[in-house]
């Protein structure tokens, strides 16, 4: 008899536990905030941030876009220097923001200063200067050397993907940026 009484006591406890679980489940359904993770949900990969490197500077949104923007700028000249400077700085501000939106204008300028020292950028810059000189009909080699001596040409080895032949090596001159710093 004692086993029958203990079996019925166990059954009662099991039934009570089941009822309590059902009540808890019903209460949880009523107060479901949707905070529990769903195994079916997939995390969205983070958007890759653009790097501010020489590839980006040389790309279509880099210096070529700046050259196109410069053609649209109309400077008034003598007597309007402040307005012209404001217009140029505004254009540069827009260009740097489009090139790398996460950086401030001051940060962008410091990045550009650093990137301008890379060999591939120097070679491209010299090519663009020569293109402009040909368009204007002037000699671009006169502006090649800005230092006190004309022996500041850098001896470079080819191996850069931007250098088409060894004649491009002559386009690269040393920067005299130490005066500015």
Curated annotation (Swiss-Prot):
One of its GO terms (molecular function) is DNA binding. Residues 9-27 have a biased composition (Basic and acidic residues). Belongs to the CSM3 family. This is Swi1-interacting protein swi3. Residues 1-47 are annotated as: Disordered. It comes from Schizosaccharomyces pombe (strain 972 / ATCC 24843) (Fission yeast). It is found in: Nucleus. It comes from the Eukaryota.
């Amino acid at each position: 008899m004692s086993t029958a009484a203990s079996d019925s006591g166990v059954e009662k406890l099991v039934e009570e536990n089941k009822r309590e679980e059902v009540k808890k489940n019903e209460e949880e359904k009523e107060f479901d905030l949707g905070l529990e993770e769903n195994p079916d949900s997939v995390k969205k990969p983070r958007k890759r941030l653009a790097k501010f490197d020489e590839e980006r500077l040389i790309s279509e949104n880099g210096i070529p876009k700046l050259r196109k923007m410069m053609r649209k700028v109309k400077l008034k000249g003598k007597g309007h220097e402040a307005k012209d400077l404001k217009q140029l700085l505004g254009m540069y501000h827009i260009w740097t923001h489009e090139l790398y939106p996460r950086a401030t204008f001051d940060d962008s300028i410091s990045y550009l200063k650093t990137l301008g020292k890379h060999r591939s950028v120097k070679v491209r810059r010299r090519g663009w200067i020569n293109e402009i000189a040909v368009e204007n009909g002037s000699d671009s080699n006169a502006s090649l050397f800005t230092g006190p001596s004309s022996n500041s040409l850098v001896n470079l080895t080819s191996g850069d993907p931007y250098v088409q032949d060894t004649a491009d090596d002559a386009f690269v001159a040393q920067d005299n940026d130490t005066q500015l710093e």
